[in-house]
């Protein structure tokens, strides 16, 4: 799907081990055997590993934030081997606290030297102080995700559009970069940034 869309990079970030049905730590250790560059075979059109290919695969993790200390569910010895790592709050791994507590947990998570992305900081079930979050992210040289799936009316996250709008306005205030994510749980959602792009254009 990524090659068909002409994408140059595809990030794969499996959820951390505490997720229901989540992978064991060994899953992440096994990333070392996965080729990172792909293209289509000329004769068959099959997608194959190819050193000079046009698509680079990045193997990462979406680690679960487990406490207000920013504790993650994947040890640093695994995190340091990832191509990239993001951290996110999920209800199965983190008990919602006050706005201050949720913000503290998020900030401490991306202060981890191996985490440079905070995933979907837009769920109304876990309210955040965006002003503090953005200032701390800027200082830590971390980026905040604009999650396309959070804008889907069927998303379990609450207040996605309103919260992402507030987040983006705060990022604009502090000149803080963001990263768009599709949160693709199926191949047909790869590269689908339509809702996020539309919202960002509206705020230009």
Where in this protein do the model-derived segments appear?
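Ser/Thr-glycine-rich phosphate-binding loops at phosphate-binding pockets of nucleotides
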Residues: 1, 9-14
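Extended substrate/RNA-proximal surfaces in nucleic-acid metabolism proteins
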Residues: 16-146, 201-203
């Amino acid at each position: 799907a990524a090659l068909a869309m002409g994408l140059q990079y595809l990030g794969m970030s499996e959820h951390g081990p505490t997720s229901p049905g989540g992978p064991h730590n060994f899953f992440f250790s096994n990333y070392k055997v996965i080729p990172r560059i792909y293209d289509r075979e000329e004769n068959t059109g099959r997608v194959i590993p190819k050193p000079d290919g046009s698509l680079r695969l990045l193997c990462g993790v979406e680690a679960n934030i487990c406490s207000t200390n920013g504790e993650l569910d994947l040890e640093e010895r695994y995190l340091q081997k990832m191509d990239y790592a993001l951290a996110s709050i999920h209800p199965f791994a983190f008990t919602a606290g006050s706005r201050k507590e949720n913000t503290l947990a998020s900030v401490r998570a991306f202060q981890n030297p191996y985490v440079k992305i905070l995933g979907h900081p837009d769920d109304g079930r876990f309210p955040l102080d965006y002003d503090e979050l953005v200032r701390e992210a800027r200082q830590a040289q971390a980026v905040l995700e604009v999650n396309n799936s959070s804008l889907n009316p069927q998303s379990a996250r609450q207040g996605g559009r309103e919260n992402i709008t507030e987040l983006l306005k705060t990022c604009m205030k502090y000149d803080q970069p963001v990263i768009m994510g599709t949160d693709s749980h199926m191949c047909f959602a790869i590269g689908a940034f339509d809702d996020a792009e539309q919202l960002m254009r509206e705020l230009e």
